[in-house]
Amino acid sequence: MKSFPVAFLVLLIFILSVHRGVTTRGSDVAKFCCFQYSHKILPWKWIQSYKFTRSSCSQQAVIFTTKKGHKVCAQPKEKWVQRYIALLREQQQS
């Protein structure tokens, strides 16, 4: 019976880590879904890359990866998000 709280805690930690939007390498589609968006505009100098969430996710999102490796979910319709995506695409082409 004492192992149940530990197992529950491990499951909760796993679910929360999925929430952060961990992505797969070499793909433009994130491995997991976002459940909430960041409410702050990230400084451009922090941004390294981006990915889109899967179409099967309940909320469409863009997951930005910072230069420190943090994953941040953002609303795709936001103007700053669209601008950052365009800038990152330009960098990839040059």
From Swiss-Prot:
InterPro entries: Chemokine_b/g/d, Chemokine_CC_CS, Chemokine_IL8-like_dom, Interleukin_8-like_sf. GO terms for biological process: antimicrobial humoral immune response mediated by antimicrobial peptide; chemokine-mediated signaling pathway; eosinophil chemotaxis; inflammatory response; monocyte chemotaxis; positive regulation of actin filament polymerization; positive regulation of cell migration; positive regulation of chemotaxis. Keywords: Chemotaxis, Cytokine, Disulfide bond, Inflammatory response, Secreted, Signal. The keyword Glycosyltransferase does not apply. It comes from the Eukaryota. Residues 1-23 form the signal peptide. CDD domains: Chemokine_CC. Disulfide bonds join C33-C57, C34-C73. SMART domains: SCY. Its main location: secreted. One of its GO terms (molecular function) is CCR3 chemokine receptor binding. It is found in: Secreted. One of its GO terms (cellular component) is extracellular space. Belongs to the intercrine beta (chemokine CC) family. Monomer. Chemoattractant for eosinophils and basophils. Acts as a ligand for C-C chemokine receptor CCR3 which triggers Ca(2+) mobilization in eosinophils. Also acts as a ligand for CX3C chemokine receptor CX3CR1, inducing cell chemotaxis. This is C-C motif chemokine 26. It comes from Canis lupus familiaris (Dog). The gene is CCL26.
